Amino acid sequence: YKWLNDTVQAGIAVVDNDNGALIAVGAGRNRKRLREYNYATMIKRHPGSTAKPIFDYGPAIEYLNWSTGKMIIDDKYTYSGGGYLKNWDNSYKGIMTIETALGSSRNIPALQAFQAVSQSQIKTFVTNLGITPEYEDGYINEAHSIGGFNGTNPLEMAAAYATFARGGIYIEPYSFTSAEFLDTGEVYTVTPEKRTVMSEATAYMINIILRNAVTNNYVSAGSKSGTDIASKTGTSTIDSKYIKSLGIKGDVIGDSW
């Protein structure tokens, strides 16, 4: 890969799927000083389509018992308050399963899934994954369904997606396991808290959809590696040059911005 120029930035976070530990952080490009702005942990950016498993299909599977074979219609559609929503390719594909809809990242089915679940259920599902939505008059705006909000970074998203990989158990990322105070000799130990935030079935189905997205070449970047990968990509509607990519491979998950 060739960078466009030296000013283009990136942030990467990698966590351990098994224990939630933060394995690696790519804070940015061309770092010259200590304590510079960290693009992996400090930014708040649109997650784009990487939000769809979290805000749309995850809650629908968890609370409405949708299966991967649930049929949904990709056709001309509007937000509740009016205004047409478009797909990334400005086309409609008609009736499809949610597996196809999420795998091929269709926007209109994603909004329908978001609308099918109650606001309180979406809030519970999302916040349990460490993501903080934005509110307008007490409501989560429907733009969240396609990642249209400023509110995540690579570390938060990696931790959220790792929950799907480990069967619905969320672990807040941590970067050390113990610390000793020099003046007292007291040792502080980090004990990761594991919380079950969704059913194992929900996590399994999202994981399968993201894995099949690679197998079926919806996500071409991961399909050439010859390894078992689950992945979701996203772009911002505000800036087409802003790209996110999440990948689950074996025992690790990485999110890049």
Language-model segments: which ranges?
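Sec/Tat-exported extracytoplasmic proteins
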Residues: 1, 16, 26, 58-64, ...
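A penicillin-recognizing enzyme superfamily signal
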Residues: 1-4, 8-16, 24-27, 32-43, ...
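Structural recognition of the beta-strand scaffold that forms the well-ordered cores
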Residues: 11-15, 22-26, 71, 100, ...
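Solvent-exposed loop/turn segments at secondary-structure junctions
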Residues: 18-19, 29-33, 46, 77-79, ...
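Active-site SXXK
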Residues: 20, 46-72, 101, 160-164, ...
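Gly/Ser-rich catalytic serine loop of serine hydrolases
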Residues: 42-52, 148-151
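Mid-domain, small-residue-enriched loop/turn segments at the edges of structured enzyme/sensor domains
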Residues: 83-86, 118-159
